């Protein structure tokens, strides 16, 4: 039973995890189910006209559902430029509306049909209206096609018009066949109808071979129409089947009603019961930099400060929990902004270059001036600049110079792609900036100096020159500061906590895995707790130690003794049920100022240096915006912190 409840929890969370239904749509569906079920029980009273009441209920239900469609459209219009040309490029903007039609309109009207009397005379009107409503997304596809064709007349392949022909003719043909069968059953037409319905659903929904991807969002308008048409015909045939209908209709109707009420009532349903006992399994997602991520609005401001534009910047992948990097696009350019470091990468200008061709020296000066003009603080004594030609463009690469060892910098540094006087491409690299100017790096040069001095003392190594040779920054993978000494010792520090993450020593006579005294000297550099550390395992070229919070791994590889430190994940499974996650969301919602459009909860591990604890990540999308507000709620204390900077 517990397994079934856990399985059901994951099914319910699927709708949250992928932002399938908005909060407004979910409540509308839930309360409509309850009201229809209650009405079905009431109409059996002898003084109530069952046919008239259920007909009026059907009319009111469809008015309410169209109001729900309007709410979804209002949100989409407010949250993005809702144009046909844009929809043709990124059809995901219509997905919330399509999800509501599939899981709201089709589900609720089907439920209403199940509750209607067999001899009701208004079903034909409802059939016509419902098929017209679920055909609207297909009509939108057709208008979007012609809008895109008008804007990009050379971008259409001949095969696209063949697809357009089928998009237009198939629903028309199915509607004609449907209403012919509604008035008079014909076995040949019935076979043709179900062949088309089932065949098209299999074609649209069955997965293709691995090498071919399928966009289920793009085919959803047809999926909705086919599901509705298939249900209506099956229901119509069921009602016409005299003996079968009389024998099973009452019990089928009651079973369906009870199932949906138990499943979807908004007060206490099967999902609520499942959440009370089931816990997340295999929680591995960890989050750093809590309180330091930037919002999509801040990212857009940063991008526009570098590349001013009056055009709308579209934010892609708005269904993601956390972006890690924000991907924007306009007609003029596209670019990404890292959610933590606030650095720009993969900028690409999409229009023609202008101006005149400059000299290599002028391109160098323009590149450095561009960074300084936008507040970047270069480490001028430690950078080099290289100019090359690629595909007719002048490429300027600014990288951190390794003063101790020769290194190929072909893929390092900030890179500029110039064509004439136009910047056609650009990506930043934090390594070329002064350490104290990087907002996401919390270790100072003095901290690094102290740790290097501690290493020299602990290992009895004479002091020698060292330098920062690389700074990595990635919201998904974390940040790292790499330091190298003249003799090839490499230290890597975590950018957020400033802790030493790894140490690499060139193998020598006294530096090897066999030297147990050396192992303890190295552990002291990592500040391992002396009274608690113990050897966990030893095999061949690897030795592991642990203390109360960390694991230290010694590995010999390619002439180097490498030492890595890991913060131990708590041994126990995630200790909180999904009900605790719901309470965490309710606490966040009580403090939230805007109208909540969609929400999602996700179990995570919060990490900062040695500290690791379980928490809930609560994602909220406000109504009328594609912004995501993220909050971290401590699993034990229920303390709420915003993931984004204040």
Swiss-Prot record:
Transmembrane segments: 20-42, 55-77, 97-115, 127-149, 159-181, 188-206, 216-238, 251-273
Highest taxon above the source species: Bacteria
Alphabetic keyword roster: Cell membrane, Membrane, Transmembrane, Transmembrane helix
Signal sequence coordinates: none
Compartment(s) of residence: Cell membrane
Record's keyword annotation contains Membrane: yes
Keyword Transmembrane helix: yes
GO CC annotation terms, alphabetical: plasma membrane
Membrane topology (UniProt): Multi-pass membrane protein
Protein name: Uncharacterized protein YlaA
